[in-house]
């Protein structure tokens, strides 16, 4: 069933007049570069298209590639302080003008880019006790999400002027945010 996305509203055509495919593969390299920490890198390759009226049209979810990195390390000389870094880069999603959802005039939003950094302090460490308390570890942390304040596009709001010309005005995802957290490990 063909569908389109108008702003953030998914609109289904209601007639099963298209065929399509969704293919992809994910690669993940996981490891502990530093003992007792998590680090990984992923590469995702994807392709989603529908065939409608003789045209091959990318679906609204057609993000062709994504690369993500997550790295964790302890501060030198202590395992009470931990630093984490997360990087993301992904292809932009396809869009088209309203009332032309299945047309060939679709375009792509800019690539998604984001960097997060965080720091945590271990409040409780019961990892090596024979009979630990309820929690294995308790961490208190602070994070800066979207460190560089990149304006990543979520969707477009379309404005039509008096001469029937349409303009795409981007709706952005959250800017830079500070986040405090507490993590309980069982």
Placement of each model-derived feature along the sequence:
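Surface-exposed loop/turn segments flanking beta-strands in extracellular/periplasmic regions
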Residues: 1-14, 160-169
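Outer-membrane beta-barrel translocator domains and adjoining extracellular loop/strand segments
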Residues: 1-5, 46, 50-58, 95-102, ...
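C-terminal beta-signal and adjacent terminal beta-strands/loops
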Residues: 89-98, 121-186
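Outer-membrane beta-barrel transmembrane domain signature
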Residues: 107-116, 120-122, 186
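Gram-negative outer-membrane beta-barrel transporters
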Residues: 4-94
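Outer-membrane beta-barrel domain signature
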Residues: 14-18, 56-60, 104-108, 131, ...
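Residues that define the transmembrane beta-barrel architecture of outer-membrane proteins
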Residues: 19-23, 61-67, 111-115, 136, ...
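Residues on the lipid-exposed face of transmembrane beta-strands in outer-membrane beta-barrel proteins
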Residues: 25-31, 69-73, 117-121, 142-144, ...
């Amino acid at each position: 069933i063909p569908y389109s996305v108008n702003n953030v509203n998914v609109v289904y055509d209601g007639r099963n007049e298209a065929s399509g495919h969704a293919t992809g593969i994910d690669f993940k390299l996981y490891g502990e570069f530093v003992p007792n920490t998590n680090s990984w890198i992923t590469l995702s390759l994807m392709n989603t298209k529908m065939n409608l009226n003789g045209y091959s049209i990318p679906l609204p979810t057609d993000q062709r590639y994504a690369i993500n990195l997550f790295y964790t390390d302890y501060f030198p000389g202590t395992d009470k302080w931990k630093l984490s870094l997360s990087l993301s880069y992904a292809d932009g999603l396809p869009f088209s003008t309203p009332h032309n959802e299945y047309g060939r005039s679709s375009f792509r939003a800019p690539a998604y880019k984001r960097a997060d950094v965080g720091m945590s302090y271990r409040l409780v460490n019961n990892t090596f006790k024979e009979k630990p308390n309820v929690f294995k570890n308790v961490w208190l942390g602070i994070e800066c999400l979207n460190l560089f304040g990149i304006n990543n596009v979520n969707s477009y709001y379309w404005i039509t002027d008096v001469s029937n010309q349409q303009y795409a005005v981007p709706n952005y995802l959250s800017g830079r945010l500070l986040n405090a957290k507490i993590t309980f490990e069982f």
